[in-house]
Structures are given as C-alpha cells and as structure tokens.
UniProtKB/Swiss-Prot annotation:
Record-stated family: Belongs to the SHMT family.
Gene assigned in the entry: glyA
InterPro entries registered for this protein in UniProt: PyrdxlP-dep_Trfase, PyrdxlP-dep_Trfase_major, PyrdxlP-dep_Trfase_small, Ser_HO-MeTrfase, Ser_HO-MeTrfase-like, Ser_HO-MeTrfase_PLP_BS, SHMT-like_dom
Protein name per Swiss-Prot or TrEMBL: Serine hydroxymethyltransferase
UniProt xrefs under CDD domains: SHMT
The organism of origin for this protein: Erythrobacter litoralis (strain HTCC2594)
Keyword set, alphabetical order: Amino-acid biosynthesis, Cytoplasm, One-carbon metabolism, Pyridoxal phosphate, Transferase
Amino acid sequence: MSTAEQTQSDIMHRFWHDDLAAADPEIAEAVSNELKRQQDKIELIASENIASKAVLEATGSVFTNKYAEGYPGKRYYGGCDYADVVETLAIERAKELFGCNFANVQPNSGSQMNQAVFLALLQPGDTFMGLDLNSGGHLTHGSPVNISGKWFNPVSYGVRKDDELIDMDEVAETAREHKPKLIICGGTAYSRLWDFPRFREIADEVDATLLCDMSHISGLVAGGAHPSPFPHAHIVTSTTHKSLRGPRSGIILWNDEDLTKPLNMAVFPGLQGGPLMHVVAAKAVAFREALRPDFRTYAHAVVENARALAASLEENGLRIVSGGTDNHSMLVDLTAKDVTGKAAEAGLDRAWLTCNKNGIPYDTRSPFVTSGIRLGTPAGTTRGFGPAEFRKVGALIAEVVDGLAKNGPEGDAQVEESVRGRVSELCSQFPVYP
C-alpha cells in the first residue's frame, strides 16, 4: 500500500471509528461537564426535563443523514421508505396520545410550530389575542420583539391584580372590542388551570380560531393530570421536551380536516424544508413512552410534587403567585424579601439548585432582573423525587433566599455550602443516567 493509500485508509478509519472524545476533545469535555451538571444539581427550570436513553439514542441515530422533504408517501427525495415509517408512527402515536384526528410532527421548535399556525391562518397586520408576557405568556404570543408582534397586531389579556388569575370577563370584553382572528390560550409561566370551554365560547362569539399552546402542560395532559384542550381548541401546539419528556421540538394537532392542507402547507414548504428525521424518530419514541401506564403515574406525580414544593416554600416564608399551583410550575414572588430574581437565580445556582429568574404579574423590574423566580418539578420527578424530597428542596431554596435577603447578591457562603452538601446527598440517592 502506498503512502497516499495508507493516509487515506487512516482518514477513513478515523471517520468511521473515532468517538467524540477522539474526534473533538473540547466538545467531548463540554458534554461530559454538562452530564455532570445534570447529575450533581437539582434541575428546577419548569421547561426542562430529562429524556430517556431511548430518546437520546433516536436523536443521535442515522436518520441524521436523511433528507425527507414532504410528507409520508409524498416526498421530494428518494430513499425515504424508513423515514416514512418513522414519521407515520410519530403521527399515529401523537393522535392516540392526545385524542385528535390529525397531527403534524415536523416543526423543529415551539417557535416554528406557532409561526406555522400564524402563516396558515393570518395575514400580516391581522389581529390576534394572547396572554401578556408579564402575566405568564410566551414570546410567540405577541411580544413586540418577536415576529408575532412585529408582523401581526397582538392584543393582550392578563391576570387580575388581586388574585393573579386570568380574568375571563376581560378576555371576553377584549375579544368583543378587537375582533381577533386568532385567540391563544396557554403560557410559559401560568400555574393555574385554563378554562378551555370558556375560551372556545369567546372564540365562537367573535368568529375566531382558538389555538391552545400547551407546551408546558402537554405531558400532564397526556398523563391525565390536566384537562385536555380538546375538543375545545381548534388547533393545539406543543413542544415535546418539557413535561412530555421528549426531544427538543414541536408538534401541531387538530381535528377539523379543513385545517389539514393550510397547516401542513405552512410547515412545509411554507416555513421549513426537510424535517429533522432523527428528531421525528425521537418524538415517536417519546410518544410511545407517554402512552404507557407508568407515564400517567409520572404526570400525576409531577403535579403532586409541585404542590408539595409550593407548600414548603410558603411554610418557609416565600409567596407563591396566585397562592399555589395546579400544574408542574410556580412563580415565587421575592418582593417581600427585597431579593431580585437575578440574584436568586445566581445564589441558588451556587447552591446547586438550578432555576430561572422570571417576571411576576405587574413586575416593576426589567426582564433581565425581575422580582421572581420560576420553579418546576418535571426533571426532579423524572429522577425519582417525591413530595418528601420536594419539601426538602423548598426548605433549601428558602435558606438560600434568606441568605440573599440578609447579605445582598453575594449571599451567605456558609449557607450555600451547606445547601450544596444536602443537594449532593439528595442527588446521589436519585442518579441521572447511572
């Protein structure tokens, strides 16, 4: 074998056989460090979870290599036989899981799934309604910095000051005044049940389409731990990586066949090209997992754990926005402690408790500082925490916050060190990817 042939052989051997550590030590180190972070810290970000080994395996599968523009049976590329199998399974499982007639499993993200609905139903400048960001809504529901607020005319509804619940009478009055073409229910930081029947009643009154973005609660809906938006919503969207415990992606669900062509055309070719088939495969895996009886147990445990965490926080002197939670999440108002959400996020992270700063209703601080933090129980529940563990977590959070209230943003180093030790002990009892 010549030198050139040997060199080429060595190159090909590396290509086919080198693992990540050999091919890219820097990225391998970052992945290893991220795994250790997830193992050693308690994840309390409400929008995060821990996917199964099977979901990770599908996400990293050879479907990464496959282009599959179009839909099953109607592709623009050859060689899509097994891509069709994967996508058809994902569609059928999604329909079974959520009790609907149609599903599009191609959206690459939550933003793109909602953009596809806008593209299918609205023209630039059309009016739609969504929950105000300061009341727990999402960027894609009309924030002025998002395409939904730049290309369309968003009108917001919010929560009452006295009880921090959505005022359905205000929703109805706003809808009658502005006559939106689309009404969105669903949010990213609202911990109470949504009145889906009333939203549909209001939508029908003003001849609007009702979209439910159930990204945060879809796992709870799938597991019977939260009311379903069907049959009330015309269209339902959801990410798949939050309480549903799948890969990072999105789906669109509906019942009316008349919506099929505009929604499918909006996703492809309107918004996307080839779908991420490795992610579609992982979605199919996650849907199958969610169809199992043990997932129902998990979903109910998420809600039970959230209530235990909220109760513990209140018992330890922290106020929960709206007085509690009906789902997986809660907002903690730190105003009385004179602690910012930014400081709390940093202090809790030093204590190995991961959360995110979050605005509270009628917050006077900027979104980069905030007066609150958002907490959630999906990831902790996945690793095996029950109510007893979450009550301990609530007490640990309160200790750190009290240290911040006493000493300012630098916190109480001794308290944070003590909390780290107890977090480490908890995590060792409930390992991640052991």
